[in-house]
From Swiss-Prot:
The lineage of its organism: Bacteria, Pseudomonadati, Pseudomonadota, Gammaproteobacteria, Enterobacterales. Heterotetramer of two alpha chains (FadJ) and two beta chains (FadI). It comes from Escherichia coli (strain SMS-3-5 / SECEC). Its EC number is 4.2.1.17, 5.1.2.3, 1.1.1.35. The record marks E118, E140 as: Important for catalytic activity. This is Fatty acid oxidation complex subunit alpha. Residues 1-190 are annotated as: Enoyl-CoA hydratase. Gene3D superfamilies: 1.10.1040.50, 2-enoyl-CoA Hydratase, Chain A, domain 1, NAD(P)-binding Rossmann-like Domain. One of its GO terms (cellular component) is cytoplasm. GO terms for molecular function: 3-hydroxybutyryl-CoA epimerase activity; enoyl-CoA hydratase activity; long-chain-3-hydroxyacyl-CoA dehydrogenase activity; NAD+ binding. It is found in: Cytoplasm. It holds the Pfam family 3HCDH_N. Its main location: cytoplasm. Coiled coil: none annotated.
Length: 714
């Protein structure tokens, strides 16, 4: 049976051809290799039509033009040569579109990303809608790749090399007005007239490329180009720590095209695409992409979720304010905040105002839309307005009696169907639900700070939580724009449990004489966004260390922090960034560059600050403990799968994405190698490094956690 075409041709009476893109059975248009023959058949018809005046590409999907190429195509390639051929085929198809003798216009509404933008760049002109859903970008670098269908060559010539490099190196997505300002699109119009605006443009002569700004013209010349690539190369190396080969190849390919011409540039692009597709970094990043896509489809349980129309939040602090913001402004739900102090409510409301006002200032949001979103949030000092809330999120202090009291009050003041979700980071959910009249409607919903930025949430059912409560809470998390993983109700849950030994070991090395900046730099070089000491300062030393005694009580001395170190620091009124002094000293609020190590820390904790370990040795000690604990969590069914374990670590604590998560990383090293390293460290530093039983067994059997396919589990 012949596959339905994703591209259909309709020639209007005014001799403008409309090519409609609609991949059958898919929500998103993605480009597949097999579509090339469909497009070529249409191009042949267009060339044979001597009356033709112009061509418009438009999508039939309600919220995307083309979201990119189908990533599975790359996974199907076994060699760099096969992936290179894939890129050359894409380049050739784009060249054939560009070579049409009449004006070709892309009418863009919604996501126009990756191969979608490369198709739009191959057109002679572009019109897009002013809708918030419309974004344009080349995000391939986030998968360890570069644009392989001409994007590295066409974009710099259209908008200038420095602007193009910023887009390609970061995967930055532009909104419609930004795209217009940079010359990436020729016009921005309301969605209702998109097609007609594109048709009008197609009836004119081919849009002439707008002259580049003087700065971009200078930077495209030999002297300016040399200076630009040197500067951008340095900046990129500092940002990636050499862990992402794609950025280096992007610079090389763009420079080749500018210095030696487009033919050499296209050759370099296809070759680099093929080689990058085979790198372990790209494979790991693509695996994370597939895993996160799967998690987003996972409903958490077999039961259908209950309706969600309105949410209540207990506590207007930093977490409560952040949760209110994502619930109202991302999920679009009515939110009622209760705090015993009116100032708490004001703080929470201001939090959302600040976030939205920032978007208005950056012209990402209209003032009217800001006001509409803010109107969803209200506050109270009692339970007025809580009677019919579907779900209540508790974000009060980490105190068991207080949280149990909140459960009792919610059951007394809310409907019988209302779910109680606790944002605890350390207290067992079963204990919080111990005196509940409806324990099946009590669950944990653990957000990470800052709430609006951190993509992960942990959903923690206790033994009596119903399947519907799980499904409803997962549904809410997704509406809030979060990636949820369901974890077991054990001390520390998953993320904090694997993070604690990592941070403990960093502090232990500090007491042994390693310098703060050396420890942090070693883990940043390894691939974490910030080092463990800085992370503790950012979270708050008081907050971040509160969980250590809980974990120590549950799991024993392997979670013990170095004696008296934390208490010495807290007794010296050091809380981290929030009070201006922790392991680092901080300058004026908001000036992150003013951070510097406080030398007074060393005598305070009785350390010399004269290190002996290399950066890889420092990283090895911290990371191995994290890996060992992650495997224990899998063994104890704290996490449901290695997929959830990898996603939780990457999205929850910034485990290096290019390594694919703790379980992918163990597989890449081999369980045998991990066990050997841990046994060596146990001999050197103590029993906390003893590899867990499952790792030892896997080592003996030569097993791995993941099968070789992208999404199957062992």
């Amino acid at each position: 049976m012949e596959m339905a075409s994703a591209f259909t041709l309709n020639v209007r009476l005014d001799n403008i051809a409309i090519i409609t893109i609609d991949v059958p059975g898919e929500k998103m248009n993605t480009l597949k290799a097999e579509f090339a023959s469909q497009v070529r058949a249409i191009i042949k018809q267009l060339r044979e039509n001597k009356e033709l005046r112009g061509v418009v590409f438009v999508s039939a999907k309600p919220d995307n033009f083309i979201a990119g190429a189908d990533i599975n195509m790359i996974g199907n390639c076994k060699t760099a040569q096969e992936a290179e051929v894939l890129a050359r085929q894409g380049q050739q198809l784009m060249a054939e579109i560009h070579a049409l003798p009449v004006p070709v216009i892309a009418a863009i509404h919604g996501a126009c990303l990756g191969g979608g933008l490369e198709l739009a760049l191959a057109c002679h002109g572009r019109v897009c809608t002013d809708d918030a859903k419309t974004v344009l970008g080349l995000p391939e670098v986030q998968l360890g790749l570069l644009p392989g269908s001409g994007g590295t060559q066409r974009l710099p010539r259209l908008i200038g090399v420095s602007t193009a490099l910023e887009m390609i190196l970061t995967g930055k997505q532009l909104r419609a007005k930004q795209a217009l300002k940079l010359g990436l699109v020729d016009d921005v119009v309301p969605q209702s007239i998109l097609l007609e605006a594109a048709v009008e443009l197609a009836k004119q002569d081919r849009p002439s490329s707008r002259p580049l700004p003087v700065r971009e013209r200078i930077l495209a010349g030999p002297l300016g180009r040399a200076l630009l690539f040197k500067m951008v190369g340095k900046k990129t190396e500092h940002k990636t720590q050499g862990n992402y080969p794609a950025t280096e190849r992007i610079l090389e390919v763009v420079e080749t095209g500018l210095a030696q011409g487009t033919s050499s540039g296209y050759d370099a692009e296809a070759r680099a695409f093929g080689e990058l597709a085979m790198t372990p970094q790209s494979q790991a990043l693509r695996n994370i992409f597939f895993a996160s896509t799967e998690v987003k489809k996972d409903s958490g349980s077999d039961a259908p979720p209950a309706p969600l129309n309105s949410v209540g939040i207990l506590g207007g602090g930093l977490m409560g304010g952040g949760i209110a913001y994502v619930t109202a402004c991302k999920a679009g739900l009515s939110v009622r905040i209760k705090d015993i102090n009116p100032q708490g409510i004001n703080h929470a409301l201001k939090y959302s105002w600040d976030q939205l006002e920032g978007k208005v200032r950056r012209r990402h949001l209209k003032a009217s839309e800001r006001d509409k979103q803010l109107a969803l949030i209200s506050g109270t000092t009692d339970y007025c307005g809580f009677a019919h809330r579907d779900l209540i999120i508790e974000a009060v202090f980490e105190n068991l009696e207080l949280k149990q009291q909140m459960v009792a009050e919610v059951e007394q003041n809310c409907a019988t169907h209302t779910i109680f979700a606790s944002n605890t980071s350390s207290l067992p959910i079963g204990d919080i639900a111990a005196h509940a009249a409806r324990p099946e409607q009590v669950i944990g919903l653990h957000f990470f700070s800052p709430v609006e930025k951190m993509p992960l949430v942990e959903i923690i059912p206790h033994a009596s939580t119903s399947a519907q409560t799980i499904a409803t809470t997962v549904k809410l998390a997704k509406k809030q724009g979060k990636t949820p993983i369901v974890v077991r109700d054990k001390a520390g849950f998953y993320v904090n449990r694997i993070l604690a030994p990592y941070i403990n070991e960093a502090i232990r090395m500090l007491t042994e004489g390693e310098r703060i900046e050396h420890i942090d730099a070693a883990l940043v070089k390894f691939g974490f966004p910030v080092g463990p000491i800085q992370l503790l300062d950012e979270v708050g030393i008081d907050t971040g260390t509160k969980i250590i005694p809980v974990l120590e009580a549950a799991y024993g001395e392997r979670f013990s922090a170095p004696a008296n170190v934390v208490s010495s620091i807290l007794n010296d009124d050091r809380k981290g960034r929030k009070n201006g002094r922790g392991f680092y000293l901080y300058g004026q609020k908001g000036r992150k560059s003013k951070k510097q190590v406080d030398p007074a820390i060393y005598p305070l904790i009785g350390a010399q600050g004269q290190g002996r370990l290399s950066a890889p040795q420092v990283a090895e000690r911290c990371v191995m403990l994290m890996l060992n604990e992650a495997v224990r969590c899998l063994d104890e069914q704290v996490i449901r799968s290695v997929r959830d374990g990898d996603i939780g670590a990457v999205f929850g604590i910034g485990f290096p994405p290019f390594l694919g998560g703790p379980f992918r990383y163990i597989d890449s090293l081999g369980a045998g190698e991990v066990v050997a390293i841990m046994q060596r460290l146990a001999t050197q530093y103590g029993s906390r490094f003893t590899p867990c039983e499952r790792l030892v067994e896997m080592s003996k059997r030569g097993e791995s956690f993941w099968k070789t396919t992208a999404t199957d589990l062992q």
